Amino acid sequence: MLKSSRETKYEIENLGDVIHPVCCGLDIHKTWIYAAILIYNFEKKQIHWITTRVTSFKKKLDKLSKWLIVNGCKYICMESTGQYWIPVFDALEDAGLKPIVAHPKYLKVLSGKKSDPNDARWIAKAFACGRVVASFIPPKAIRNLRSLVRFMIKISHEATSNKNRARNCLTSLGLKLDDVFSDVFGKSSRSIINYIIAHPGEKFDVAPFVDKACKPPFAMIQDSIDKAIDAKQDAGTLLKLRKALERLDDAEKDIQELKGNITQQMGAYKKQLDLIRTVPGFDTDPFTAMRVLIEIGPDMKVFPTMKHFCSWAGVCPHHDSSAYKVKGRRISRSGTYLKPLLVNIAKAVVRSKNHPEISQRFNRIKNRRGYMKAIIAVCRMFLTAIWNILSKGEPYRADGFMPVNNGNNKAISISQALAYVRSRGYAIIDDNSGALTTTGSQGT
């Protein structure tokens, strides 16, 4: 069992409306974790502190969980400090406690009172009074899938970087394979590149390496290779090209392995995936719906309304105003992994004529606010649809969005029309007399 601080500390303070009279604040570091349990006495307006310090090893985290249970503390609040909070959160969750992770901006300590024990006490005070906004932490199974997907995205970025390095090497060697092949990293092109790397400066017949389904004629490919082959090819560039291609092959192999593992684990969420695939743009690639579900989680009850959901994803303007002055309306930086995916889907869907409810809204906003703001508005349409279909368990319906007023039922009086024309700088001339009109009746 952990040892608490040698002297328990009491404070006389009226915390006002206390939501959690018994809670704990954790100040997490790489090696040490400072814990402070707050016990509030409503009658005496008194705070009783019980503090301790533990290391971040697994056995010590289990002892920390038992220490919290012995002291009757069920709710624990901590900052989202890098990756350090993850093992602490997992250990407390496995022990049946209710840990809460919050953004550091909600837990800033007053200047001049900064220390690790004071940080833990401040976190406990803020959480007890309900001043902490909890971050969305999905279930453990989704968290594990999320880490795999994000790791796969990092590897795909590395694969793209290695493709660019390989293209630069081919350009330096004078091999203009992109002029004759649509895909430089296709089967035929890679076979030719591998032979050039293995036999530098040697001229050869490309016919055995080119697939029969390849569109460019053999003569054209042969001519392109013969012009580029040179006995004085730089050995360093060839080595760099070979290493870039090896890294590319390893990355693509890892991506396929991760995709297979993720797809297998996502079998438990088939119902939610089928619903998400009914949304326009999410039915082309099955892995797209998986990525979205892994980021948002299968349960929409954690978001009270679709507005909260869209705000969490970072596809709505933030509010920043003071003294009747609006300082900014830009979208937040939330949704680092979800937002780029939605933007790519939106750019493809708005070009389609199969979904007028989306393309009409996009064109209407684009004319007023610009292209990217209209794309973000379409992303919000996607999230609104996903929140509703997952909450209600119903597939996507195009008539779920408000119909667009096409302007056919607009009406204006003659006097209003004449006043509008005059406001635009036009002089109204009578058709019969040719004289300028001065009243609405003369213009008719």
Task: Kindly label every feature range from the protein language model.
Residues 1-444:
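A detector of single, family-specific signature residues
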